[in-house]
Amino acid sequence: MGGINMEDNKKTIFSGIQPSGNLTIGNYFGALKNWVKLQDEYNCFYCIVDLHAITVRQVPQELRKRTLEVLAVYIASGLDPEKNTLFIQSHVPAHTEAAWLLNCFTYLGELNRMTQFKDKSQNAGESISAGLLNYPVLMAADILLYNADLVPVGNDQKQHLELTRDIATRFNNLYSPTFKVPEPYIGKTGARIMDLQEPKKKMSKSAENKNGYILIMDPPNIIQNKINRAVTDNEGIVRYSDEQPGVKNLMNILSTATGKNVESIEKEYAGLGYSKFKKDVAEAIIAEVEPLQKEVKRYLEDKSYLEKVYKEGAQKASYVANKTLSKMKRKIGFVLDK
């Protein structure tokens, strides 16, 4: 199978991002920059999880557009298609098949206890989809199909990864060792970029207040305006403290964008107030995203290249996923078709 370069001595990593909206600097600083650092050390599978995106209604043409945009952002961020398996989730049917199988080894009570489901279903009433309830099982399938050793996750996904571990252990105990039980990988920096207006919440593209997030593709003037409006406090002191969540968040952003540690940032802005600090945070973000934006636009203009990447990625992913799926079916007791 040409192009499948799974090095046995390397551990495997799986992660993905939903194409359910434009990506934020939270995605970039919190996930993508860390992923790039991992690509030489691990066998990496990075997915665009479009099956997860449809747990809430999507406009079809927008979903198609954003799926390619996420792929372009992956590559523009520095994820090399030669070093990583970059693919679209729906192009590998093993994900949905494995999700059904794992559903049969997951308890309803476990899914009802998922905090994210409870939060999202509160306002949805009867319109909540079964897909949203089963979302963590599909996530388990995503991870277990590739025998991932490590999964880069934010705090909001830790509970889902715990469920993945429980499902894998349950299946292994019921039959025989089949899956690796994955561990979380949490990056040392940028693991959690918060909302600019509600700094106790994670930055999210689904936030109601557009001033709460900065998109990777936002122009410089918008970035400057959003940082200027970012919530701080009346202290006027640049200090890394849980009692100043807005300032702490801006310091995290500046630290991740520039590589400076928070101690040196505190010293640099001692006695200067927030005006210069905010200006420099905005400039640091712009310096990071402007070259990225040019690369994203360049890749989006070359649809044939993106098609080549996602087709080769799906082929490589399918090769690995189908082997795991066949093993699952055999252990469960299905008659295999080949």
From Swiss-Prot:
EC number: 6.1.1.2
GO cellular component: cytosol
Organism: Clostridium tetani (strain Massachusetts / E88)
One MF annotation (Gene Ontology) recorded for this entry: ATP binding
Function summary: Catalyzes the attachment of tryptophan to tRNA(Trp).
Protein name as catalogued: Tryptophan--tRNA ligase
Motif 'HIGH' region boundaries: 19-27
Enzyme class: ligase
